[in-house]
Design a protein with these regions (language model features):
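Catalytic adenosine-cofactor/nucleotide-binding cores of aminoacyl-tRNA synthetases and other
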Residues: 204
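His/Asp/Glu-rich acidic catalytic environments and adjacent acidic regulatory segments
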Residues: 1-201, 212, 216-221, 228
């Protein structure tokens, strides 16, 4: 349903934000703020509304508005398609079967019992069926068998990659459209566009924070990595 509704709501949103007459009235109020006495709440509301319109293309010229409309409409189709593929791929691999009881070692008994009951309902009594949407973390954390943990991790990590629900091409298109949209609105990247409304404000500030944390956190991270390696050897 969202695949049908999303383009319609996007068109409606564009019709509102790109309405020249409506934005002129908003801009008139915004530009007059310096000479008016607004309380804090009203001033914030005016700023938020103006910013929302500006971030959705209201300041663009007519030609760029049409480009913005086209980009928005394409994204309105691709974005739910991406999510739909993720959901379908998740459903496809959701039932994880284990037939060897020895591979269950370490998994809490309550989860083993639930998997056994599910297997019975599926007509495979004597096996265990784990729903990965709820049991993924349990298997990875508690299962003693390394090959099982690896198998589950690979299954979850390879969703929508090279199969019937492959999202690779969709991701490329979304990435390019987001970049083009950000450029159109005066931002270097999509990250800059998004972060402009967040505490970080820009990707450069994010990179600076990461760089500032690298040196003081490196030694502890290395120790944690060594501890994990040692723990993995113990499990083997």
């Amino acid at each position: 349903l969202i695949n049908d509704i999303n383009p319609l709501t996007t068109k409606l949103s564009n019709d509102i934000y790109l309405n020249k007459d409506l934005f002129l009235r908003i801009k008139e109020v915004f530009d007059s703020m310096g000479g008016m006495s607004y309380n804090e709440e009203d001033a914030r509301l005016i700023n938020e509304i103006y910013s929302s319109f500006a971030r959705n293309g209201a300041n663009l010229n007519d030609d760029d508005k049409e480009i913005y409309r086209k980009i928005s409409q394409e994204l309105s189709i691709l974005t739910p398609k991406f999510s739909d593929n993720v959901l379908k791929a998740s459903n496809k691999i959701n039932k994880y079967w284990i037939d060897d009881e020895n591979l269950l070692t370490g998994i809490p008994q309550s989860f083993i019992d639930a998997a056994s009951e599910l297997a019975k309902k599926e007509g495979r009594e004597g096996s265990w069926c784990f729903s990965l949407d709820t049991n993924f973390g349990i298997i990875v954390k508690f299962c003693k068998d390394r090959s099982t943990r690896k198998d589950v991790l690979c299954l979850m990590g390879s969703k929508c990659n090279g199969d019937e629900f492959d999202n690779t091409d969709i991701l490329r298109k979304i990435s390019k459209l987001r970049h083009d949209k950000a450029n159109l609105l005066g931002y270097d990247t999509h990250a800059d566009y998004v972060l402009n409304r967040r505490m970080a404000q820009s990707k450069n500030n994010v990179y600076k924070l990461i760089d500032d944390l690298i040196v003081p956190s490196f030694d502890k991270s290395k120790k944690e990595f060594d501890d994990i390696k040692a723990y993995a050897k113990e499990l083997d």
